């Protein structure tokens, strides 16, 4: 069977979907991957896939760009004749599903990996875009077999908005985490709090920095490490805006890295005060796999992985004072940190291992090698 994977960024093909693609291939399926450019092409091809480049405009208001993307997808789908399409994130989900259905593909399984800024913002522009996007989602989902969601909030919201019937929606536990790579190790004694994210406002970067500033006045030995790259999207934080927190010693900022493992090993607690509408943050799962307690927000996706008081804490979005309080609790209660550490690992083994998640994905798409075609 030929499986087509439609991606918004080449990097996600091996970072987030690599294990799933390998599972497709191990089940005896041919995989064609579609991405927007030739970035990271060596890593993509190393998965054992055929790669096709179809650029698209990331701007939500580029109507002509979207039409061109849809037409190119339809053209390639007609030529490739895939048996099944697996597509993820907003534009690949909408236009990949519409193009696939129009081209006669009988099995289409889009995955909603979060709702993005459009569904989190209260601006007039966001409201208009939500209306347009909703119409497109509703039309796109008509030709799909199942629609896969990564958290319960997104699934519930789309069903309540009438984008799809409840029986067509199914939830998986995020993208899963490779527990052989992210394996548990001992917690350090020093209170080291790590945040990994793109440097944008909605990820809670300022809340992390402000909380760090407050806590360090009382606990100067505590360390706060922010890991991630600067971004050019709406809501991006500039180096100049971040610099005061670095200069006064509130946070350490190593920048972006290809390997987060050494930083997770060094950290005692993982922190992600996000209010961005993503599916289920992969960084939270990686921290849990390494037996790290997590402080995150009471927010879609985050509250699926973290049980308040069990494997970490849920704080209010945009609230650096609430965040600082929970950080201080972790510093003052090392035995609770140890307990939450064990619970994080147990929860990850039970629900979020990539093997468990991928098995569920294969079952949803009915791609077991023993299936009779």
Question: PLM ranges: what are they?
Answer:
Residues 14-15, 19, 191, 195-214, ...:
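A conserved mid-protein helix/loop that constitutes part of the nucleotide-sugar donor-binding site
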Residues 228, 237-257:
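Nucleotide-activated donor-binding/catalytic signature segment of Leloir-type glycosyltransferases, i.e.
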Residues 265-279, 292:
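Acidic donor-binding loop of glycosyltransferase active sites
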Residues 293-296, 306:
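Short hydrophobic beta-strand element within catalytic cores of glycosyltransferases
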Residues 307-309, 313-320, 329-335:
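Conserved acidic donor-binding segment of nucleotide-sugar-dependent glycosyltransferases
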Residues 322, 329, 336-351, 357-363:
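A short, well-ordered alpha-helix in the C-terminal region of glycosyltransferases
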């Amino acid at each position: 069977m030929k499986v087509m994977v439609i991606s918004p960024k080449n990097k996600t093909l091996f970072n987030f979907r690599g294990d799933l693609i390998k599972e497709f291939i191990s089940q005896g399926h041919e995989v064609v991957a579609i991405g927007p450019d030739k970035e990271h092409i060596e890593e993509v091809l190393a998965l054992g896939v055929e790669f096709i480049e179809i650029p698209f405009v990331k701007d939500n208001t580029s109507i002509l760009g979207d039409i061109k993307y849809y037409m190119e997808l339809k053209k390639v789908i007609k030529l490739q004749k895939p048996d099944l399409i697996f597509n993820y994130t907003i534009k690949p989900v909408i236009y990949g599903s519409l193009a696939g259905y129009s081209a006669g593909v009988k099995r289409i399984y889009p995955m909603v990996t979060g709702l993005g800024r459009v569904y989190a913002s209260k601006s007039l522009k966001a409201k208009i875009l939500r209306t347009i996007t909703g119409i497109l989602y509703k039309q796109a989902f008509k030709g799909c077999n199942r629609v896969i969601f990564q958290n319960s909030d997104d699934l519930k919201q789309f069903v309540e908005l009438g984008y799809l019937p409840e029986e067509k929606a199914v939830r998986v536990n995020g993208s899963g985490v490779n527990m052989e790579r992210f394996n548990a190790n001992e917690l350090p004694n020093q209170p080291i709090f790590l945040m990994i994210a793109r440097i944008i406002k909605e990820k809670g970067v300022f809340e992390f920095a402000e909380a760090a500033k407050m806590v360090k006045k009382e606990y100067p030995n505590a360390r706060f490490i922010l890991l991630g790259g600067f971004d050019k999207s709406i809501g991006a934080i500039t180096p100049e805006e971040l610099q005061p927190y670095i200069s006064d010693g509130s946070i350490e900022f190593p920048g972006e890295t290809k390997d987060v493992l050494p930083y997770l090993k060094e950290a005692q607690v993982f922190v992600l005060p996000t209010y961005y509408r993503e599916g289920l943050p992969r960084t939270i799962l990686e921290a849990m796999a390494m037996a790290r307690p997590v402080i995150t927000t009471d927010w879609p996706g985050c509250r699926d992985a973290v049980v308040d008081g069990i494997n970490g804490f849920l704080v209010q979005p945009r609230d650096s004072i609430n965040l600082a309080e929970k950080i201080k609790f972790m510093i003052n209660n090392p035995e609770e940190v140890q307990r939450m550490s064990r619970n994080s690992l147990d929860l990850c083994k039970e629900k979020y291992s990539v093997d468990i998640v991928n098995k569920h994905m294969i079952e949803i798409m009915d791609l077991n090698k023993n299936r009779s075609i």
